[in-house]
Every structure is written in C-alpha cells, then in structure tokens.
Amino acid sequence: MASTDTYNPTRDDFAAMLDESFAGGNLQESSVIKGKVVAIEKDMAVIDVGLKTEGRVPLREFAGPGRDNEIKVGDTVEVFLDRIENALGEAVLSRDKARREESWGKLEKAFQNNEKVFGVIFNQVKGGFTVDLDGAVAFLPRSQVDIRPIRDVAPLMNNSQPFQILKMDRRRGNIVVSRRTVLEETRAEQRQELVQNLEEGQVIDGVVKNITDYGAFVDLGGIDGLLHVTDIAWRRVNHPTEVLTIGQTVKVKIIKINHETHRISLGMKQLLDDPWQGIEAKYPLNARFTGRVTNITDYGAFVELEPGIEGLIHVSEMSWTKKNMHPGKIVSTSQEVEVQVLEVDSVKRRISLGLKQTMRNPWEVFVEKHPVGSTVEGEVKNKTEFGLFLGLDGDVDGMVHLSDLDWKLPGEQVIDNFKKGDMVKAVVLDVDVEKERISLGVKQLEGDPFAEPGDVKKGAVVTCEVLDVKESGIDVQIVGTDFNTFIKRSELARDRNDQRSDRFAVGEKVDARVIQFDKKARKVQVSIKALEVAEEKEAIAQYGSSDSGATLGDILGTALKQRDK
C-alpha cells in the first residue's frame, strides 16, 4: 500500500490560510503563484495555493535533467495557475509551466546581455538535440555541438554545461543554442593565455598533429603552430611526409607570432646552421662540382650540391645541341652529374648551374676539325624557304643558303633537286661559335666562273651555243665557260629586219661581243648586233675611205673575203 505524507496545520496556520483564502480572489489565471506542499499522494503533490481547493501536480514535473527532484511536505514552491477551478472543482496547476515562465525571463535577459546559460542535452532529434534550459526547451543543431564533428555524443548527454543562445522567439517558443561557440571562446581564451607565454626565437617541443601538402601542424600544448614545408629543412622537401609523421615529437623554433590572429609560424631548419652563409666562397663562378639530381621539371633540373644547397640547371644549359628536349630525357632523378657554377645569388638563395659547360662546345670542335674552306658531307635534315639544313659531325647543323646552291640557276629552282635524307657535300664558308651557326655552300665545290673568267671580258668576241629559242630572244652559253646569258631580240642583228629569233636553232653556234661583265652583280651580257657594228667599223677603216667611191656593200664584201682567206 502506497504511503501518504500528510501535513497537519496548526490553528495559526489555519488563520494564515484563511487570510490567503480571502486574498485568493486576487489570483489570476496564467500567472505564476506560490503554494505549499500539503501532501504527497503516490505520484502527485498536493499543493495549497490559497484557493477553495488544492491543486495536484505530477511529481515528475519537479524532476528534470541535472536537477534534484525530491520535494517534501511543507515545501513552498512556485507553480503556474492554469485554471482556478476545473470541472472537479480543483485548481489546475503546473510546475513545468512555472519553471518555463521563469526560465524564459532569465534566458531573454541572458540573450540580450550575450551571457552564457546552463542546460542539459537530454534527447536527440532530427538535425540535432534538445536541451533543457531549466524548464525551457532549446534546439542544439548538430553543427553547433563541437568545434569538430563528433561521432559519439553519449558523454555529453544529461550533464549540465554552458551554452550560448544564438536566437530565440518567445511567441513561437523557439530557442536555438550553441555549445561550439562556447568552446571556441574558451579555446580562444586558452590560446591567448598560451600565446602570452611564448616568444619568438623560443625553442620548444611539439607533436605533429596534422600534415598537409604545404606543411604540418604541430601541437605546442594546447595551441597549434604551422611548420611550413619550406622551413622543415634547408634542402628541398617536396612533401612534409618525407620527413614527418603524425604523432612524431619534434623540436621546433618559433619564427613568428601574430598576437591578433594567434597564428604561430614554426621552423625546424632554423635550429641548424644556415648552409648559405659564405656560399660565394664555397661555390665560386665557373668552378665544377658533382651533385645529385633531386627534381626534374619542364624548365630544368635541380641538383643537390650538399645537404641544404641546391642549384638549378636551366633547360637551356643542359645540352649544346638538344634545344627542345625535355630535361627528363637528358638526366634522371638521383643521377650523379658534374655541373659548372654559372651564377650565385646569396640573397635570393639561388645557384645557376650548367651541364653543357662541362663538355666541349661542339662548334669549337667542328671548326677545329673542319676549318673554313674545307669540304664536309652531311644529311639533309630539313628544307626551308631560305635553304637546306645538313646534319654534320658532332651533332651540329649547318645551313646552305639558297644563294649558295648554284652559280647559274636560282636557288628556289635548285632546292627542289634535294630531299630529306640525301647525303650532300658542301664547303664550310663560316663558323660562328658564339651564335652556334655554320654556313655551308654547295656551289663552292665548283670554281666561281666570275672569279676566273678567262678570255671573257667586256669587248671580247666569244662563241656562244644556242640553248633555247624564244620569241623575245635566245638563251646561250659561252662556249668553254659556265657563263649562261640571254640575248634579247634587239641584240640579235644590226639590221632591224634580221632581229628575229627564228633565224636561230638550238645547238647552233654564233659569235657575239661581250657588252657587260659585272663581277659584283654576277652578270654577263653579249650582243650579236654589237659584234656586227664593230666589224662594220673595222671594215670601213681598213678597206675603204670616205672619198674612195666604194659602196658599203663593196667594202663589207671585200672584208668578208679577206677574213675567209
């Protein structure tokens, strides 16, 4: 049988209660009032609030997460008066509503003053959790539970802890709180305190907490510092995992502290001597050293000369002849190579190295083996609009310009006689070692007809062979020479009626007089007309005079007979 606690009032108590009863007429529904526990029956508390009848409140309404729920007869409690009297003649009371009203007032004040409030997480709902704020129920979004996502929230349940109110609407009864904001604020305060105890230049032990592509975060005992990948070692570190592992204890030096953002920059290499000190003396210009290839890029290869000291071989300094080849096809990672120091910049911490400088310049070697004027043979590697490129000894190329293909024919015409892969002989005309150029000539394999023209000179009479007959004139070659020229129609005869190209046939030989021989312009011109005019003048001078009475025909006839004899 369930026990029942009963409160037996004294005569004075009855008098006081009678006074309160008369005062009960001033009580209003939907307000918070005080009452006294007069009995506890099973799971109900009987409360006298000074009305005609007592009200009953479930004991569970006095319980709650994080609260002592034991009440006893004689306790004074605050309850919410829902109705003065129900159908059974009893006062309708609620402890929950009283607490909620009281709590909302406190919460609104805390919200306005941006103060923390205490509550208990007691249930999980969609998207988050419900929190009891001393009678008022608030919503805690999952994203506001902690600074980082957590899987197990059980340890956080049913424990009184601080929260920050993010927003609240009393009319709708909505309250949203955050535990994360409180943690962040607490952490910021802790960070501030920790930062105050740290100094730039201080050496401290830490634990590697996280590793990224750009560095590692090190826990310094409640506050993290960033160890950038460039500050791990003096040598090149492509990724922090080459040196560090999560959980590893490392000794670091505090490089910089930003007291506003609480960011701390750390360094490991700063604990060691700077290998770049006195670098110019260690690696003088043009000196040669052996190093190891550590990294290859599109623009060159990095070579480690000693721990912490690397230099770059630019792609342009890798080979004398392999101009457009990727560095990875010339050297390989970890390969030992001999390099020459080209430039040292201690301020920017850069060393420029050369690989090709450790080998002889192939153009110097070529000119030693093949001086200007010597004959070489090479394979046609390319044909362009301005000449031929021949592959020569020493993996160098030489160019035959169009103008150096033939003495007589235009280069644009002659170049069609060559194709890729042909082996061609040529004369070395010039070697420019600095510009890495070799000039060759094919026509120079034969003598220059203008250099040794023989009897061909201006005014000389020459015999020509007809090569081609055209309406505008005839193409001829001076017999016994390499001179080809064109006799235009006006120069075919002295008499206008005889200036016809159809008078001549291919293979026919004709005499003509040289009227132009220009070595500089490389031009020779002959004329049959000029020869006839000269012969006419000579005949008149030799066989006739102005007063002889002989006709021009008689004089020429006599001259021709004399020549034939």
From Swiss-Prot:
- Record-level Gene Ontology MF annotations: mRNA binding; structural constituent of ribosome
**Annotated keywords:** Repeat, Ribonucleoprotein, Ribosomal protein, RNA-binding
Q: What the entry says about post-translational processing?
A: The initiator methionine may be removed.
* InterPro entries per UniProt: NA-bd_OB-fold (IPR012340), Ribos_protein_bS1-like (IPR050437), Ribosomal_bS1 (IPR000110), Ribosomal_protein_S1-like (IPR035104), S1_domain (IPR003029)
User: Which GO terms are recorded in the biological process aspect for this UniProt protein?
Assistant: translation
Where is the S1 motif domain positioned along the sequence? Answer: 30-96, 114-180, 201-269, 286-356, 373-443, 454-529
Q: Which GO terms describe its cellular component?
A: cytosolic small ribosomal subunit
Q: Which family does it belong to?
A: Belongs to the bacterial ribosomal protein bS1 family.
According to its UniProt entry, the function of this protein is described as: Binds mRNA; thus facilitating recognition of the initiation point. It is needed to translate mRNA with a short Shine-Dalgarno (SD) purine-rich sequence.
The protein here is known as: Small ribosomal subunit protein bS1
What is the taxonomic lineage of the source species?
Answer: Bacteria, Pseudomonadati, Pseudomonadota, Alphaproteobacteria, Hyphomicrobiales
